[in-house]
């Protein structure tokens, strides 16, 4: 399997600062390590501060699998991520 870079964009129901506290928490760090996701970047739009981008790297197909799991969806929504607004694109270098 090759390494895949996954770009997620989505809207927040809370502020970016509130969401970042959750995303940068030790619990979410442990989750990323357990499932094999490496976060590379997270940021907010200059135009719309409730629009977020997150870039992960993982084995090909892993991020889409993780982010389609109902338990994962429930957990990320509890942190302010509006899942229905999520757009996922995947990128490879080979």
Region roles according to the model:
Residues 77-79:
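Short, exposed beta-strand-loop hairpins at the edges of beta-sheets
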Residues 1-73, 82-94:
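Short S/T/G/P-rich N-terminal loop/turn motif that feeds into the first structured element of a domain
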């Amino acid at each position: 399997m090759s390494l895949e870079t996954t770009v997620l964009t989505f809207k927040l129901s809370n502020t970016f600062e509130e969401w970042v506290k959750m995303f940068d928490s030790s619990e979410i760090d442990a989750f990323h390590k357990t499932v094999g996701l490496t976060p590379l970047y997270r940021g907010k739009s200059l135009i719309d501060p409730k629009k977020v981008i997150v870039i992960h790297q993982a084995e090909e197909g892993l991020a889409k699998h993780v982010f389609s799991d109902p338990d994962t969806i429930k957990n990320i929504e509890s942190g302010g991520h509006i899942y229905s607004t999520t757009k996922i694109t995947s990128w490879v270098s080979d």
